[in-house]
Amino acid sequence: MSLEELDNEEMVEKYRLYTLKKILFIVMCIIAVVVVIGYAATIGSSDISAIDVYRDIWYHFIDPIKCDETIDWAVFDIRLPRIIGGLIVGSCLGVAGAAMQSMMKNPLADPYTTGISSGASFGATLAIGLGITVTGSAGSLGLILTAFFFSLVPATVIILVSSLRNTSAATMILAGIAVMYLFNACTTLIKLGISDESLSAVFQWSVGDLSQVTWSNCAIMCLFTLAGTAILMAMSKKLNILITGDKNATALGLNAHRLRIALLIIISLMAASVVCFTGIIGFIGLVAPHIVRIFLGSDNRYLIPASAAFGAVLLMVADLVSRVVIAPTFLPVGVITAFIGCPMFLYLLIKQRRTMW
């Protein structure tokens, strides 16, 4: 066997081990999700062991007759909607953040870069403070739909601006920032004229909350998350090419501008679908993809699913901490995501010597 053949075999083996490492990371995150679900479901006013939780989940789907009615009610009607909601939201923001960073070629990008959070906040403030909704009626449905509608307005503005000329990623970011400041100013003006009770409700919504998530909410968020993730996975190779630069993408037959617009639409719909139900939960879409990228690199074929799994773990753990740190009072989950994610991210960033991009 020649020296060249030996080198080729060694390279193939290294690539195989590197791929295995990526798959193992995703599997470990999935196992962590299962463990966190079991433990989080034990936290509440009534004591339920983790074994009882797993048993109830098993019997609930396999043999419902064997379920303890009290435990089943506490687990499936009270605790699991919030837990599964955290899983879906964390996955959605992780995927959207990974795609946004790759699309924009900007390590500071996240799902809210295009102004989605400010648009949603404006819509929620309109609904809560002034009772103005897109449905014409007050209530949770009006709030959700109004927040969803206005969260998509900034992305629509960016798309319209981009249609006038082939704008770069930097221009799209700047347009998003401009719209964000406009919506923030409008939101502040509304807050100046609403009651203290409404102002408190707006604040609670703006810091992110999983406690009001229902199974129907989970179903809608899951639909957007699964569909968006599947489409982004199908586009992952094109996204890898886009990272190398618009000129290289064009040379390989890709229309970088159209691809970026398509990605922006998908990411915006994913982020809007969770923000309208849970409020603004920050840091997940920024930190989760970064941490995954440190371990697995920037190949979106693995980065996207790994960011989904790690984002779910990160948000579920943050929500768990928010429920127990000063129980029975709940801290805003957005505060905990920052406290957990920021030190973890800084530590890994300082420790990591090789470039991630």
What residue spans do the PLM features occupy?
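Alpha-helical transmembrane segments in inner-membrane proteins
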Residues: 1-357
